[in-house]
């Protein structure tokens, strides 16, 4: 199955994106980054084998914990509120971009 890695601040965002991705044949692996904590840390192997990485955080990419894991991977950024309110559009946009 095609994997998308999602880095987010809460499980609501991850679950909504995961549901939509599953409908389209993609699997979402996610970790929660809140403050200085990482919950459900994703391995470097999973990150490197993913089709894409999606950051849905209310902070800049430079402030992500252990950012070195994400060097040289295809990534996307979206506001958490957009991901929660329109998860289908977010996932469809990523898949469309990957297929181009």
Regions found by a protein language model. Give the residues of each.
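Anaerobic metallocofactor- and corrinoid-dependent redox/one-carbon enzyme cores
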Residues: 8-11, 34-38, 74-80, 86
């Amino acid at each position: 199955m095609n994997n998308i890695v999602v880095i987010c601040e809460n499980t609501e965002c991850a679950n909504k994106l995961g549901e939509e991705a599953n409908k389209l044949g993609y699997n979402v692996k996610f970790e929660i980054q809140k403050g200085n904590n990482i919950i459900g840390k994703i391995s470097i192997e999973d990150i490197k084998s993913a089709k894409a990485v999606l950051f849905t955080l209310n902070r800049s990419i430079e402030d992500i914990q252990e950012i070195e894991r994400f060097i040289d991977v295809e990534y996307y950024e979206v506001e958490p509120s957009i991901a929660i309110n329109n998860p289908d559009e977010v996932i469809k946009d990523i898949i469309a971009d990957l297929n181009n």
